[in-house]
Amino acid sequence: MAGQNTSNITNESISEFVYQLDSQPYNMTYADWTAEWWQWAYSVPRDKNPSYDDTGKYCGENQQGPVWFLTLSYEHPVTRICSIPENTSLLATLLNSECSFAEYPNLASLSDLRSCAKEQQDHVVSPMASLNGTEIPNLEDFRIQSGLFNITLPLNNILDLPAQTTQAISDGNWIFIKPLPTGTHKLILKGNVADNINNNINNGSSFEFAGPVGWNYTTTYVLTVKDT
């Protein structure tokens, strides 16, 4: 695959670059990989957390192994310029939600966590992603709820909670991209939140609504895949 130019890929060929939902990349399910994404996202203190990075300076924070994780901007649209090792897959969120016992101490069970994450993610509509100008289709099909997993929050974590280990469940829309050819690629990610979200909040929810991570902001990644 090295050296292949993906700038002219079509809707018919784009699926070649995306892991299918029933696949097990690197012998793990999609759901297990999404839990790994959350564990990574919360492991980085806020001052270096890629979710609050406007330039791509911190793309490589705590990244290791065959999969790198990409996150949307939490605050405003951004363009991030990142260097990615060759032969590395990319797991990116298109808007995701997560509920933990640390954030919601009133929740008492696994079922409560599942319902909380689902209720938040139900507000997400029309996730969008494009690779080198070609839109990736059928992203609504890539909504995944995880199993129960542990997260460890460091000091100065992005939840602004005391450092601790807790349990969580996530629900979200994702895109899992196979290793890209060496060269430069543009990946654009965006989720949308339903117009009636404010009404849902005002009418009272079963859980205090924090909103899906990422909201309506477009995040553009300019990715350079380098020979190792």
Where are these regions (language model features)?
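Beta-strand-connecting loops/turns
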Residues: N87, T182-G183
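Extended, well-structured beta-strand/loop surface patches
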Residues: V125-T182, K190-V225
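A short tyrosine-centered beta-strand micro-motif
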Residues: A92, H185-L187
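N-terminal segment immediately downstream of the Sec signal-peptide cleavage site
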Residues: N5-Q64, W215-Y217, L223-T228
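Conserved aromatic-histidine-acidic binding/catalytic patches
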Residues: L21-P25, R80, G172-K178
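Extracellular-facing segments of soluble proteins and assemblies that are Gly/Ser/Thr-biased and enriched
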Residues: P66-L155
